[in-house]
C-alpha cells in the first residue's frame, strides 16, 4: 500500500507523540524583523494624467435593502452604500435577491448598471432569472467607475444611527462580499490581493470595540500585524499592515457586463423619472440599484452625496502595495494609473475639479511615498 507524503508525515508525528515521555514546550518560530520592501511612488505634478470627481450615495442610517409595493409591481431596493459600493456590492445583492425567494416571477428588471446593479443582475442570473437592466448610464460613465476599488467597508453609516438589524445586515454583506471577491481574483476581472499599509502619526492600530460591527469584520483581513521600527519602510512612526483586495473598476465593470450579456441579459438605456414609470415596466419584480438617483426617483431625502476627488499619476508596475493615511490620503496602484486620494466632502454636490485639492493630495502623498527615509 502506497503512503502519501501527507500520510507519512502525519504518521511520523503521531509516532513521535506516542514515544514522548514528558511534555516538551513548543517554541514559536521567530519571525525575521526585516524592513518591508516597498517601491517608491514617483509623485510629481508632471506625472499627473487626470483628475476625476464622483459623488458617493450616502445614507446616515446605512444602505437600504427593503421591499416596496407599487401597484402590482414589487420593488426591492438596494442602494445607499456610501463609500463602499464596490466593496459591499455582492453582499447587498445577496440580501436583496434573498428577499425575492419564493416569489413566482422569473423575469425581473434591475435599475442601474453600476457595480451594485451588475452584481445584483448576475446573482439573479445565477439563480435562473431572466434579467433586463434599465439604466441611464453604462460603464465607463457610471459612478462606480469613479471609485478607488480598495476592498474596505468604510463610511457606510453614522455610528449613532446604527441599529441591531442593520448591524447584522452590514456584517453579513461584508462577509459574503469578501468571500465572493476571492473567487474572482484574476487578471480577467481586475481583482488582486495586495498588502495595504495603514500609516499613522498619532498611535498604533487599535482593534475595533466589541460593540462595533467592525469587530466582526476586521478578522477577515489575513496576515495583519503592527510593524516594528525595524520593519517600517515609511517616514511615519506607526504602520499597520494587512492583506486586502484591489478591484480595478475599468477592468472589473467591463468583465461583469460581459458576463451579464453572455448569460443573455438585456440592457436598455433609458432614464426612468418616476415611480409610475417604474410600475409601468413589463417586469413586475424590480430591483432598484440607482444609487444617488434613488433620491429623486423614489423620494429618499436621506440620501446625500459624499464628494470624492481622485488624481491619477502615470502607472508604475513595480508598485505592488496600497497605503491609507496619514489622515484622509491614500494610494492604490492600478493599471490605469497610480490613484491618489482623497476627499470625503459630505453634502457637497459640486463635481467641478478643485485645483487646491489636487496640490494638497500630491504634496501629502509625496511626503510618505516618494522614497525610503530610513537607513
Name each model feature, range by range.
Residues 106-114:
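Beta1/beta-strand and adjacent pyrophosphate-binding region of the FAD-binding site
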Residues 138-173, 229:
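Glycine-rich active-site loop/strand segments that organize a redox cofactor
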Residues 244-315:
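Predominantly flavin-linked oxidoreductase catalytic cores and closely associated redox partners
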Residues 24-71, 80, 84-94, 115-127, ...:
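Active-site substrate-recognition segment that forms the wall
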Residues 11-15, 53-72, 144-146, 183-259:
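Flavin (FAD/FMN) cofactor-binding and adjacent substrate-gating region
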Residues 84-88, 166-173, 240-255, 353:
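Short beta-strand to alpha-helix junction loop
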Residues 1-15:
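N-terminal secretory signal peptides and thylakoid transit peptides that target proteins
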Amino acid at each position: 500500500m502506497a503512503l502519501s507524503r501527507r500520510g507519512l508525515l502525519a504518521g511520523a508525528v503521531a509516532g513521535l507523540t506516542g514515544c514522548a515521555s514528558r511534555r516538551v514546550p513548543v517554541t514559536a518560530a521567530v519571525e525575521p524583523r526585516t524592513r518591508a520592501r516597498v517601491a517608491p511612488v514617483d509623485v510629481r505634478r508632471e506625472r499627473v494624467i487626470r483628475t476625476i470627481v464622483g459623488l458617493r450615495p450616502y445614507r446616515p442610517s446605512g444602505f437600504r435593502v427593503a421591499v416596496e409595493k407599487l401597484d402590482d409591481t414589487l420593488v426591492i431596493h438596494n442602494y445607499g452604500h456610501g463609500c463602499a459600493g464596490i466593496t459591499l456590492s455582492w453582499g447587498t445583492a445577496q440580501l436583496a435577491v434573498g428577499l425575492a425567494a419564493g416569489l413566482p416571477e422569473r423575469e425581473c428588471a434591475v435599475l442601474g448598471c453600476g457595480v451594485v446593479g451588475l452584481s445584483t443582475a448576475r446573482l439573479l442570473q445565477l439563480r435562473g432569472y431572466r434579467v433586463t437592466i434599465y439604466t441611464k448610464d453604462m460603464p465607463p460613465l457610471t459612478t462606480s467607475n469613479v471609485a478607488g476599488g480598495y476592498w474596505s467597508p468604510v463610511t457606510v453609516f453614522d455610528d449613532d444611527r446604527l441599529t441591531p438589524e442593520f448591524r447584522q445586515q452590514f456584517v453579513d454583506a461584508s462577509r459574503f462580499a469578501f468571500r465572493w471577491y476571492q473567487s474572482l481574483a484574476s487578471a480577467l476581472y481586475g481583482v488582486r490581493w495586495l498588502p495595504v499599509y495603514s500609516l499613522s502619526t498619532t498611535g498604533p492600530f487599535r482593534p475595533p470595540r466589541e460593540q462595533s460591527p467592525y469587530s466582526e469584520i476586521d478578522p477577515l483581513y489575513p496576515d495583519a500585524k503592527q510593524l516594528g521600527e525595524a520593519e517600517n519602510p515609511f517616514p511615519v512612526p506607526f504602520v499597520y499592515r494587512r492583506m486586502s483586495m484591489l478591484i480595478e473598476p475599468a477592468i472589473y465593470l467591463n468583465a461583469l457586463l460581459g458576463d451579464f450579456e453572455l448569460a443573455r441579459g438585456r440592457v436598455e438605456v433609458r432614464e426612468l423619472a418616476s415611480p409610475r414609470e417604474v410600475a409601468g415596466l413589463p417586469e413586475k419584480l424590480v430591483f432598484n440599484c440607482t444609487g444617488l438617483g434613488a433620491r429623486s426617483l423614489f423620494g429618499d431625502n436621506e440620501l446625500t452625496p459624499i464628494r470624492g476627488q481622485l488624481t491619477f499619476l502615470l502607472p508604475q508596475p513595480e508598485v505592488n502595495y496600497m497605503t491609507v493615511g496619514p489622515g484622509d490620503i491614500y494610494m492604490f496602484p492600478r493599471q490605469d494609473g497610480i490613484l491618489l486620494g482623497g476627499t470625503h466632502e459630505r453634502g457637497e454636490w459640486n463635481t467641478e475639479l478643485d485645483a487646491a485639492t489636487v496640490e494638497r493630495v500630491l504634496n501629502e502623498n509625496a511626503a510618505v511615498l516618494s522614497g525610503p527615509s530610513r537607513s
